[in-house]
Design a protein with these regions (language model features):
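Active-site mouth loops of central-metabolism enzymes
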Residues: 7, 16, 23-42, 61, ...
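Structured alpha-helical segments in the cores of large, soluble enzyme domains
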Residues: 13, 17, 40-50, 100, ...
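Hydrophobic or amphipathic alpha-helical targeting/insertion segments
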Residues: 84-124, 131-148
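Hydrophobic faces of well-ordered beta-strands that scaffold small-molecule active sites
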Residues: 27-33, 58-60, 87-93, 110-112, ...
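Catalytic alpha/beta core domains of metabolic enzymes, predominantly
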Residues: 128-145, 172-230
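Glycine-rich, proline-tolerant flexible connector loops at the mouths of alpha/beta enzymes
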Residues: 34, 52-78, 114-136, 202-211
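N-terminal amphipathic alpha-helix/helix-capping segment at the start of soluble metabolic enzymes
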Residues: 1-32, 146-155
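Alpha-helix-loop-beta-strand connector modules within alpha/beta enzyme cores
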Residues: 65-91, 139-156, 185, 189, ...
């Protein structure tokens, strides 16, 4: 028999509604809707099909406040369909931190992208920061992210920190380059704030189209988390 040396890393348990995620639980099945979030009837019908087929979480693109309002209606209808009550919805938010705040009051989980949560849309510009200026940017990040964490605590909403290789901020790119180290630091900036605020209902993801880059980055992230005991 082939003996595999890989094993699941021990983690805390993240609660997404009534669903538990972590090393002590099965790997969960999540999918993403391809309907317009504002097509409420179509989105509800697709959600019901997804959950009936075995999906455990369903993610919706959430571009603005109109989509947040639509998500609230979708969630209400989906919960009425569910016999178990375990049908968590996820809002996928980019560029607008206030939309993430609003979505956290409506659904069970919110995904944010560190590359555009508070930093402006990427312009592929090299920006030279002094150490003091860089720390000031990190403090600005902390102050804004803490507001979202407090909302999530109040509403028992989970968070996903979802880093994309293709959307690292100009700030990260200027200091770390287009590297696994930059992706890891983009994630860790937010995770450090969550740890300091004792917020544990959190999921991490790092994606790259190049699988070697992605595997290297995930391993580096695990090493960095172990170093910082986070």
């Amino acid at each position: 028999d082939i003996q595999l040396t890989y094993h699941r890393r021990h983690t805390t348990t993240t609660k997404v509604g009534n669903l538990e995620i972590g090393s002590e639980h099965p790997v969960r099945v999540q999918t993403m809707a391809n309907t317009s979030t504002n097509d409420i009837d179509g989105s509800v019908a697709q959600a019901n099909r997804c959950f009936a087929a075995g999906a455990e979480l369903l993610r919706y693109t959430t571009q603005g406040m109109r989509e947040v309002e639509s998500l609230a209606q979708i969630r209400k209808a989906v919960q009425e369909f569910s016999s178990s009550g375990v049908t968590p919805l996820v809002a996928d938010v980019h560029f607008q931190s206030d939309v993430a705040d609003a979505a956290a009051k409506v659904v069970e989980k919110v995904r944010i992208n560190p590359g555009n949560y508070i930093d402006p849309a990427r312009k592929f510009k090299q920006i030279d920061y002094t150490d003091e200026e860089y720390q000031a940017e990190l403090e600005r990040l902390r102050q804004r992210f803490v507001l979202l964490l407090h909302i999530c605590k109040e509403h028992k909403t989970a968070l996903r920190i979802g880093v994309n290789h293709g959307s690292l901020s100009d700030r990260i790119m200027s200091r770390y380059g287009d590297t696994p180290e930059g992706m890891v630091e983009s994630c860790m900036e937010f995770l450090r704030v969550a740890v300091a605020e004792d917020f544990k209902d959190i999921v991490l993801s790092i994606k790259a189209s190049n699988t070697r880059v992605m595997v290297t980055t995930v391993r580096l992230l695990v090493w960095q988390m172990q170093e910082e005991k986070s």
